[in-house]
Each structure stands twice: as structure tokens, then as C-alpha cells.
Amino acid sequence: MKHIFLSFLALIFMSGCAVTAEEISHNVIKKDGNIEIRQYDETVIAKVTVEATRREATSKAFRSLFKFISGDNVAKQEISMTAPVSQQPVSQKIPMTTPVAQESAGEGQWQIAFYMPNDMEFDITPKPTNDNVTIERIPAQKMAAIRFSNRSTDDNIAKHEQELLQYMTDNNIDYIPEPTYAFYNPPWTPWFMRRNEVLFKIVE
């Protein structure tokens, strides 16, 4: 019952943040329809690794991450929630990047990340009390992103991931071939209002 109540509060919190939450700092270098080339500043994430299917991974990791930003840290400090929540397969073994298609929907390890506010540097980020939560600094980087609505199903993600891959190929953009998935809304958001993204790190 306690777990259900906490999850309910967390989802209410996310609902409020979906509209007002601070987004991680970046500049749009180029926009072409629903595709953008972005330059991201250095940022800090709190991440949890879970064993699950892609669709289950965020739910399994959310509680630990939400408790961390709610004060379950050494400093007992509450941290503002930002957008998006990102998701990345661990098996791809690359640093967690900014904005939670995968060809396989089977179980595997996934990293789910919350981004710290833009003014919170790595050295002042509170230390987690939960060993499952890890703090990581992400260097400044250039990313290609495609934005889309509707539900974050494997098919919908795969469709837009392929569109972004084709765009980068057509425009001779070198990239690291491992995606990051980014989600901005709580589950009950109407499908036509949802914001999802697939991102790839650009090689410079």
C-alpha cells in the first residue's frame, strides 16, 4: 500500500512538472521539420540501472529516482524535477546522454535517468543514500533529435528512430549508433499531446 501511495504521489508530481518543468539546457543549431540538431551544455544526471523490458524499465526505476530528488540523499535536499526522463540500453556501453528504435522488446539492462537542474553542478549534487542511484557528469555534446507524439510503443519509437537514421545518412552526419529515448509526460497524457524523442550523439 505504501508503494502504491508513493507511486501515486510521484505521478501527480510528474503531471505538474510536465508543463512547468525546466528542460535541460541546449541550443537548436538546425531545425528541419520534426528533426533538430542540438548543442547540449554539460549536465548532471541521477541514474538507475534495472533489469526489465524497455516498457517496464522506467516504472521500476522511477521510485528510487523520485525518492532521491525528494530528499532521500545525504544532504536531505529536495531537487526540482526537470524534463525529460531518459532511457538507454546498458548493453550499448556508451556514456549516458541527454535526451527514457529498440529492435528487441525482450528483457535486458536499461539505464533510466533524471536530469539535475541546469544550475546544479556535479560537485554540489547531493550524494544518494540509495546505492542503486548513481550521479554522473555528462560532457557538452551535439545531438540529433527527432520529436514525435502518440504512445511510446516499440513500433512508434522504431518508426521515428529509422526516420532520424535516414536523415543523418542523407545529410552525411556521423553519429554514434546507439539511441537515447526521452519522455516528457505522465502516462495519462492524451496521446496527441505527448512528447517523445529519439536522440543520437553526433561525432565531431
Identify the residue ranges that each predicted region occupies:
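A solvent-exposed interaction/effector surface
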Residues: 2-5, 15-204
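Repetitive helical segments and hydrophobic/amphipathic motifs
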Residues: 11-12
